[in-house]
């Protein structure tokens, strides 16, 4: 008498998500992009997965941690692209990012370590621009020298207009101060995008400036700008 072959273990999508450490939504996305397919479906239409499905999810996660896109992962897993070639190209991208990040680190170190150095808040646009380049994987356009100079001029005008508001007793949330804050927010957004660290950078530079004034920016003016920007939080860009 032949013994029945035991049925292989099957997992529902929620069970697979828990076993592999991802969300159900992520598994649905993997299916949508062709990276994962259900082994079978129940009569009720529920997706079922097997052991190989779990292994595939772990492989996808490993490649994602290396920084590969889902498109690249699919090509590698389907064999249409050599994984070695993908790794080599990705290494080249990482080396470029490391070089950019190292340059940014050196700039920030020069601005903060040397206690005798004059840290100019007017350099903020250039600093944020460098940060944006260092963190962006694909840079489609670069700021020319003329554009950088134009932005620095705008930043100085913002400083002067803000100083006039503060010296004139204008409340940080007053109409004139708001108009200047809108211009400041727009300029910062052009350079850094939706980066939550902008406020942090402003506060750090304000602390570094005490007790001296840096290119016309002092802690009081920095705080005034911070309050004016805070008054715009509920307003759209």
UniProtKB/Swiss-Prot annotation:
Which domain of life does this protein belong to? Bacteria
Q: Which UniProt keywords apply?
A: DNA-binding, Nitrogen fixation, Nodulation
**What PROSITE patterns has UniProt attached to this entry?**
HTH_MERR_1, HTH_MERR_2
> What processes in GO biological process is this protein linked to?
nitrogen fixation; regulation of DNA-templated transcription
Which segments constitute the HTH merR-type domain? 10-79
Specify the DNA-binding region ranges: 13-32
What induces this one? By the isoflavone genistein.
Question: Matching PANTHER family, A to Z?
Answer: HTH-TYPE TRANSCRIPTIONAL ACTIVATOR MTA, REDOX-CYCLING DRUG-SENSING TRANSCRIPTIONAL ACTIVATOR SOXR
Q: What is the recorded name of this protein?
A: Nodulation protein NolA
């Amino acid at each position: 008498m032949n013994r029945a072959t035991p049925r292989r273990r099957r997992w529902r999508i929620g069970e697979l998500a828990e076993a592999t450490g991802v969300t159900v939504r992520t598994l649905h996305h993997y299916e949508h992009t062709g990276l994962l397919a259900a082994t079978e479906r129940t009569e009720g239409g529920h997706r079922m997965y097997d052991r190989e499905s779990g292994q595939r999810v772990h492989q996808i996660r490993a490649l994602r941690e290396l920084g590969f896109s889902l498109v690249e992962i699919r090509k590698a897993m389907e064999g249409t692209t050599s994984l070695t070639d993908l790794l080599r190209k990705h290494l080249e991208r990482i080396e470029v990012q490391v070089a950019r990040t190292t340059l940014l680190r050196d700039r920030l170190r020069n601005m903060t370590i040397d206690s005798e150095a004059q840290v100019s808040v007017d350099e903020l646009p250039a600093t944020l621009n460098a940060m944006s380049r260092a963190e962006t994987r694909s840079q489609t356009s670069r700021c020319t020298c003329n554009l950088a100079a134009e932005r620095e001029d705008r930043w100085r005008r913002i400083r002067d207009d803000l100083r006039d508001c503060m010296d004139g007793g204008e409340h940080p949330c007053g109409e004139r101060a708001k108009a200047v804050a809108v211009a400041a927010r727009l300029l910062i957004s052009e350079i850094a995008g939706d980066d939550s660290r902008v406020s942090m950078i402003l506060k750090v530079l304000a602390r570094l400036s005490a007790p001296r004034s840096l290119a016309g920016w002092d802690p009081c003016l920095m705080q005034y700008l911070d309050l004016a920007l805070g008054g715009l939080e509920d307003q759209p860009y």
